[in-house]
């Protein structure tokens, strides 16, 4: 190693070639990093610049035109005298370092000349590889001391062969290989400052070592185990600052040129005792060379460069030799918190260039390169550049360099690339490089296949587009006008682009659109295909309405539209709460079951408004055609999709609320069973891919909320009923109907009658009378009709009382209406003047025109008009009462019992009457006759009741042989109404026992429950409706099965008010409730008339008549 004092002897003045070297350097000094991963290249002269750059630059340092060495470190060989001087001074310097610095392991290098203010300096101990020619890439002109003035030879500074201590920079992702540039980014400001000072001092040498962790990102080596111990000795050819993407701070980008392999022997991390113990005064003791300014030649390429620090030749005049201690080149780095390392050079193991294995591996690498180059143009450029840099022209002569090149251009794993760098055995290195290159070959094959597939698709589309453009041009030249088909095709394309069609649907759409483009508009198939595409593009694929999961808003909306219906409202609120927690909701299938007029259909619309969904309703009552649900086949003329697809088209969303009304009245015919078609539609597990016969593509209905309505569940097929969540809506009681009438029905009817703001009062007692005497059903539909009738009658009376003068017909018409009336009268007068008899068709058209609505002015009612409708004058508006009372008997005779029934109209009181058809004699025979339009179940109930009543009499009243001789007739009034259901058992039994015991029943007791032969009372349904009917009939007690106790407890208090509920388990309990004061001795006496006694009475009567 040469000390600074010896520099003038080695670097002689080369003034004769100063201008030529300076001119050459100016064209190559501006170095720019290549924005790509991996190895990076710098700007080259135009004649040596490749046509394309790859992600891994293969630019090696270029020597002179006639240079025969590969990666040669000099432009011109040194003289024998200079070479001997170098060796002598190196030996002297080594001895001085060993004696004076026993603790320090780092050696000193040549002192650099001072850097000028613009960041450019001539290198004394080394040169910049990026700014000149040759492997070192730069040239420097030392001082003229020690060289004769007449010596004009120019010697290029040599890269130090021994540089024991350098600053270490960790590298991420992939290692550096000797001879191949790489750009790195320094984010640590301390490291960036150290690099800047190194460049200014002319010591731009660092050690680059690969991180073991791929995700590591640091500019300082904290621990020796964090990096691999084999790296490269690299020269910083240029460096320039860059702003970060976030605009905060700045980083330094440096271009490194690796020269040789080195091994890390010792790490001196920042802040270590060894680094702190070194006296910083050594740096200050170093003599500062004074630069001799030289005129600089600036060309266009240099002006465009953005290099902050580069290396050019410059003349340096050193100061006189000082008497201080020898200069240490890296001592100035001790003040920076950077990592320093002691390194040793690694040399390749000797090998036989003629080895058959090496030659075979070399040939294989060359063959793989050829194959990769044929598939990847970037590799082709890299190989071309590598070949140009090899002046020998024979890759066999440099197998080690070929292995490094193979690893440098391959995108292998960091560990695999590090193994190539760490291998000093050439044969082993080539094997590992071949493995990495083979993997790159596989990647290139896959990339080539993908590229070909993409190109084929693009080429096909481009060809189709080119042909279509040609066809349009031919039509335009021939003057053939477009038939509108092209516009239609473009319209369908635009509509489809706005939709998120599934892949299967998109394929069908493309096929049909292609078919449409090739069909003639006059063809019948053209209209079929056009209609199909129109439906396909009107389905809201991927479009959903924003749902409202606000609980308070839902409560407000539901309460505004409906009174009561607590169960339904709670279920909807549960649905909204689940959607709020999950962020989304799936489609559900709800079925509202209840009597007519309770709000089943209208509640569906309120639910849609509360959820913010679109609403669609269709009825399936009496539906017999499956095509109404699943659509028609396209082969039929006038084919249409099913009602569900029509609902999606109308609502324009995938998540509407669809109300299927009257699902219990669906029919069945020769065209199929619609209820079976609904199985797929209303199954959450299947409707995600609902297949309509017309569309013939799967449609997702899983987001649709289906709501069905029915009066009864008996007629709904069981598989279909199982798919729905049934919510029962019971009938309204009198109090609820009163509230509904006051809050909803009366204001609506008043507004519809044109009496809004007019003092027309419908009193509370009038509404009660309507409920009691006119509208006894469980719903409010008839009540609504009666209230509307009341307000219509009121409007008629008001208009009649005010008279025609309040608003004459001439003043009622607006200007528009008057013009229409004048036109009509003019036409009539013209027809009359012509005397032509108008035809029936003309008369019809004239009448139609006359009946056309004409704009009119609304009549204003004076404020003094007051109308009051109360209980007394109610019949003047709605007529006489329809019902007098539910109670047929104020006092029931023996054999008459009040039962309770549950029908589609709600609950009703049902009497059971039993009479004795003839006198009880010893000769009479027992019999039972049943009337009242009873169906099978009630007939069986009557038979069971008759048998059980006979058993009770035989057991408890054996002497009363009533059923042995009695001819009994049992009747249920209102025979025009069919009656069926298992809930009249105890009522019939009680009626028969009342007749047998000749004891009347309390008329304020009603009962319901089915009976077994052993006397067990079974559970029934519709207890709420039946309780409402009992209350309406004025009952005070309701007897019901004990199994229905939970239903009784759920009844609102206003329903149970004034009624005592008595649950029973056995009929014996019913008997004790019905006959609490029965005289058992009297009841146990026989009521049969003996035959001899009757004969004596008859003969005596006959004799009396004869006398």
From Swiss-Prot:
User: Where does the record say this protein resides?
Assistant: Mitochondrion matrix
Regions of compositional bias (Low complexity) in chain numbering: 832-845
Compositional bias (Gly residues): 122-141
Q: Keywords in alphabetical order, please.
A: ATP-binding, DNA-binding, Hydrolase, Mitochondrion, Nucleotide-binding, Protease, Serine protease, Transit peptide
Q: Identify the residues that the record assigns to the Lon proteolytic domain, covering every copy.
A: 891-1077
The protein's name: Lon protease homolog, mitochondrial
Give me the segments passing through the membrane. none
Q: What is its EC number?
A: 3.4.21.53
């Amino acid at each position: 190693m040469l000390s600074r004092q010896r520099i003038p002897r080695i670097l002689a003045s080369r003034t004769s070639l100063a201008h030529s070297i300076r001119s050459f350097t100016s064209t190559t000094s501006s170095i720019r990093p290549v924005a790509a991963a991996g190895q990076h290249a710098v700007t080259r002269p135009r004649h040596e610049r490749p046509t394309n750059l790859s992600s891994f630059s293969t630019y090696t340092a270029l020597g002179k035109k006639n240079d025969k060495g590969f990666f040669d470190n000099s432009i011109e060989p040194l003289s024998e005298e200079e070479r001997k001087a170098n060796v002598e001074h190196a030996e002297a310097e080594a001895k001085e370092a060993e004696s004076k610095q026993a603790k320090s392991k780092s050696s000193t290098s040549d002192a650099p000349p001072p850097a000028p203010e613009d960041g450019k300096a001539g290198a004394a101990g080394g040169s910049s590889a990026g700014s000149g020619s040759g492997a070192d890439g730069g040239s420097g002109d030392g001082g003229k001391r020690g060289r004769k003035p007449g010596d004009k030879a120019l010697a290029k500074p040599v890269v130090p062969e021994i540089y024991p201590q350098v600053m270490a920079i960790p590298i991420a992702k992939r290692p550096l290989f000797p001879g191949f540039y790489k750009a790195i980014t320094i984010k640590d400001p301390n490291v960036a400052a150290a690099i800047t000072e190194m460049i200014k001092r002319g010591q731009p040498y660092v050690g680059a070592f690969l991180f073991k962790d791929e995700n590591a990102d640091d500019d300082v080596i904290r621990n020796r185990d964090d990096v691999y111990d084999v790296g490269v000795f690299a020269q910083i050819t240029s460096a320039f600052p860059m702003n970060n993407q976030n605009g905060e701070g700045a980083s330094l980008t440096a271009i490194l040129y690796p020269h040789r392999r080195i091994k890390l022997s010792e790490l001196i991390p920042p802040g270590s005792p060894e680094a702190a113990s070194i006296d910083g005064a050594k740096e200050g003791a170093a003599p500062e060379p004074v630069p001799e300014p030289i005129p600089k030649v600036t060309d266009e390429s240099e002006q465009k460069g953005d290099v902050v620090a580069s290396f050019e030749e410059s003349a340096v005049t050193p100061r006189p030799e000082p008497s201080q201690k020898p200069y240490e080149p890296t001592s100035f780095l001790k003040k920076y918190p950077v990592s320093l390392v002691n390194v040793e050079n690694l040399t390749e193991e000797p090998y036989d260039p003629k080895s058959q294995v090496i030659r075979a591996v070399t040939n294989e690498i060359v063959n793989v390169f050829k194959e990769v180059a044929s598939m990847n143009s970037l590799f082709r450029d890299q190989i071309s550049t590598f070949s140009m840099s090899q002046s020998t022209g024979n890759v066999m002569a440099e197998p080690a360099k070929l292995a490094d090149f193979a690893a440098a251009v391959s995108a292998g794993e960091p560990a695999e690339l590090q193994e190539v760098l760490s291998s000093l055995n050439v044969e082993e290195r080539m094997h590992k490089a071949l493995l990495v290159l083979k993997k790159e070959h596989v990647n290139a094959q896959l990339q080539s296949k993908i590229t070909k597939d993409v190109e084929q698709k693009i080429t096909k589309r481009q060809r189709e587009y080119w042909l279509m453009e040609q066809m349009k041009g031919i039509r335009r030249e021939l003057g053939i006008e477009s038939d509108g088909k092209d516009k239609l095709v473009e319209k369908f394309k635009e509509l489809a682009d706005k939709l998120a069609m599934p892949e299967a649907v998109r394929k069908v759409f493309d096929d049909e659109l292609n078919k449409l483009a090739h069909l003639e508009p006059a063809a019948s198939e053209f209209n079929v295909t056009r209609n199909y595409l129109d439906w396909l593009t009107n389905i809201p694929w991927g479009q959903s309405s924003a749902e409202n999961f606000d609980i308070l808003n839902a409560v407000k909306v539901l309460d505004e539209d409906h009174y009561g219906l607590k169960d339904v409202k709670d279920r909807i609120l549960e649905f909204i709460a689940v959607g709020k927690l999950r962020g989304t909701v799936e489609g559900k299938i709800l079925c509202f079951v209840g009597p007519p007029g309770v709000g089943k259909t209208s509640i569906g619309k309120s639910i849609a408004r509360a959820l913010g969904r679109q609403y669609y309703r269709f009825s399936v009552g009496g539906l017999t055609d499956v095509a109404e649900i699943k659509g028609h086949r396209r082969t039929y003329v006038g084919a249409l999709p099913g009602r569900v697809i029509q609902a999606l088209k109308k609502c324009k969303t995938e998540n509407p609320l669809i109300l299927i009304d009257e699902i219990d009245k669906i029919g069945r015919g020769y065209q199929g069973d619609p209820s079976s078609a609904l199985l797929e539609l209303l199954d959450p597990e299947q409707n995600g891919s609902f297949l309509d016969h017309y569309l013939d593509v799967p449609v997702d209905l899983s987001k649709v909320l289906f709501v069905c309505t029915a009066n009864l569940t008996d007629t709904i097929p069981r598989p279909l009923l199982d798919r729905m969540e049934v919510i029962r809506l019971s009938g309204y009681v009198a109090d609820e109907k009163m509230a509904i009438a006051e809050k909803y029905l009366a204001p609506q009817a008043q507004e519809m009658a044109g009496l809004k703001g007019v003092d027309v009062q419908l009193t509370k007692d009038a509404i009660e009378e309507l409920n009691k005497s006119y509208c006894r059903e469980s719903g409010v539909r008839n009540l609504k009709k009666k209230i509307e009738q009341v307000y219509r009658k009121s409007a008629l009376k008001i208009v009649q009382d005010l008279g025609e003068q309040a608003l004459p017909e001439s003043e009622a018409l607006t200007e528009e209406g008057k013009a229409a009336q004048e036109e009509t009268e003019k036409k009539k007068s013209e027809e009359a003047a012509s005397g032509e008899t108008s035809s029936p068709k003309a008369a019809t058209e004239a009448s139609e025109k006359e009946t056309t609505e004409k704009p009119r002015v609304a009549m204003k009612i004076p404020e003094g008009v007051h109308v009051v409708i109360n209980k007394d004058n109610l019949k003047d508006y709605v007529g006489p009462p329809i019902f007098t009372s539910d109670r047929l008997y104020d006092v029931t005779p023996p054999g008459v019992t009040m039962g309770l029934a549950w029908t589609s109209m709600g609950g009703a009181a049902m009497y059971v009457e039993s009479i004795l058809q003839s006198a009880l004699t010893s000769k009479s025979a027992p019999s039972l006759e049943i009337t009242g339009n009873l169906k099978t179940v009630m007939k069986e109930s009557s038979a069971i009741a008759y048998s059980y009543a006979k058993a009770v009499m035989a057991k408890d009243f054996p002497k009363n042989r009533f059923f042995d001789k009695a001819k009994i007739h049992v009747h249920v009034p209102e025979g025009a109404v069919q009656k069926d259901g298992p809930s009249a058992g105890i009522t019939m039994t009680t009626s028969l026992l009342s007749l047998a015991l000749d004891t009347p029943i309390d008329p304020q007791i009603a009962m319901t429950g089915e009976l077994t032969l052993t006397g067990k009372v079974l559970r029934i349904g519709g207890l709420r409706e039946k309780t409402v009917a009992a209350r309406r009939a004025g009952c005070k007690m309701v007897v019901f099965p004990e199994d229905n106790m939970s239903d009784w407890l759920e009844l609102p208090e206003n329903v149970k008010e004034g009624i005592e509920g008595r649950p029973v388990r056995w009929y014996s309990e019913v008997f004790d409730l019905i006959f609490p004061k029965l005289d058992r001795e009297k009841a146990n006496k026989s009521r049969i008339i003996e035959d001899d006694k009757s004969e004596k009475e008859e003969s005596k009567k006959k004799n009396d008549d004869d006398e």
